[in-house]
């Protein structure tokens, strides 16, 4: 069952001071300034003393065909000396004078009380006389340059355009919100991470990632002499981080010292090498004039260049004494800060939970 369109009541207050229309004559006979025309399910009119809130005040000089235009609302009125016709529906067989509205903030008496209210004022000129036939035939297309008649009527054409728009493929927009783990990434790491996302998953993508990682290690080895022993690295993995520190700090154990002399242990981890390599590739101007060097278990430095807030796992941790300008290895673990120090003309990157002795 077709649903009926909901109708909203419209109130028009006709102000005809010359009393040349039926509305003006009724208002004059009742000694009232306005004649109210109410349009809803029915049409009614009566003389009133003042307009109501949200009402239209139509000021006319005499008879005429008036069309009030208020956004999507259109009210058509025929005012003659002997009758009144009004509608909010389409009424295209007659010509009308278009009248625009002006909202105004006023105070009016409503239900016996003075209230602040908005009214919409509109003024007609009476240039279109009532019931002038509209000569334009809506079904007849005028002869317009560069325009041809379509094979569809207007409803079919609108439906056709709608169907084409709905059937057209739509571009899917993916979210580009950063992931939570990227919060602790350096600029170079975030860039590498973005490049990895762009690679299509598959065999070729994995090969590109492996090749990129291999190139990083080659560049690092060309700059820094790591002096790592593969056999020592295997022993370090088996013994664990705690035994490394114990081996480095236990100077009294002669058996261990003899073993260390033959195969020196290292506190440098694979993760440390990867992170340092990325820092070197940044080519920071503060470090351009310095050559890279590895930190010892303990040593001195000339000056502290900068500290950065980073978060990495399984790296050597140092304590710094800025007054004596020395650093000392504590253990291997997680860090949140890293110190960049210089010794002579060398750059030493000590990743640590930065603490001052």
Curated annotation (Swiss-Prot):
InterPro entries, sorted: BTV_NS2 (IPR007602), NS2_N (IPR037194)
UniProt superkingdom: Viruses
A molecular function (GO) term: RNA binding
UniProt entry keywords in alphabetical sequence: RNA-binding
Segments of skewed composition (Basic and acidic residues): 233-249
Coiled coil ranges: none
Keyword RNA-binding annotated: yes
Biased segments, Acidic residues type: 250-260
Region (Disordered): 169-191, 229-266
Cross-referenced Pfam families: BTV_NS2 (PF04514)
Family: Belongs to the orbivirus non-structural protein NS2 family.
Function summary: Single-stranded RNA-binding protein.
Name the UniProt record assigns to this protein: Non-structural protein NS2
Organism: Bluetongue virus 10 (isolate USA) (BTV 10)
Gene: Segment-8
């Amino acid at each position: 069952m077709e649903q009926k369109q909901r109708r909203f009541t419209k109130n028009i207050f006709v102000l005809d001071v010359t009393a040349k229309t039926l509305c003006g004559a009724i208002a004059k006979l009742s000694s009232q300034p306005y004649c109210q025309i109410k349009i809803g399910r029915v049409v009614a009119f009566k003389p009133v003393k003042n307009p109501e809130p949200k009402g239209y005040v139509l000021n006319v000089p005499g008879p005429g065909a008036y069309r009030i235009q208020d956004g999507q609302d259109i009210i058509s009125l025929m005012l003659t000396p002997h009758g009144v016709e009004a509608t909010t529906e389409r009424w295209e067989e007659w010509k009308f004078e278009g009248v625009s509205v002006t909202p105004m903030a006023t105070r009016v008496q409503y239900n016996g009380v003075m209230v602040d209210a908005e009214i919409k004022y509109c003024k007609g000129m009476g240039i279109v006389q009532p019931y002038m036939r509209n000569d334009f035939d809506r079904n007849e297309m005028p002869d317009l340059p560069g325009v041809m008649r379509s094979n569809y009527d207007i409803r079919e054409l609108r439906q056709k355009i709608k169907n084409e728009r709905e059937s057209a493929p739509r571009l899917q927009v993916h979210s580009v919100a950063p992931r939570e783990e990227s919060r602790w990434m350096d600029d170079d790491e975030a860039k590498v991470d973005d490049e990895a996302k762009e690679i299509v998953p598959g065999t070729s993508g994995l090969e590109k990632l492996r090749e990129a990682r291999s190139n990083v290690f080659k560049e690092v080895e060309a700059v820094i002499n790591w002096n790592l022993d593969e056999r020592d690295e295997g022993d370090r993995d088996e013994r664990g981080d705690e035994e490394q520190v114990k081996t480095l700090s236990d100077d009294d154990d002669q058996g261990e010292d003899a073993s260390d002399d033959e195969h020196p242990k290292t506190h440098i981890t694979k993760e440390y090498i990867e992170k340092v390599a990325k820092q070197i590739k940044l080519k920071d101007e503060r470090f351009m004039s310095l050559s890279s060097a590895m930190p010892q278990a303990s040593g001195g430095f000339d000056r502290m260049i900068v500290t950065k807030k980073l978060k990495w796992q399984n790296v050597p941790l140092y304590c710094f004494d800025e007054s004596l300008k020395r650093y000392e290895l504590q253990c291997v673990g997680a860090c949140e800060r890293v110190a960049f120090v210089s010794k002579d003309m060398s750059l030493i990157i000590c990743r640590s939970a930065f603490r001052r002795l």
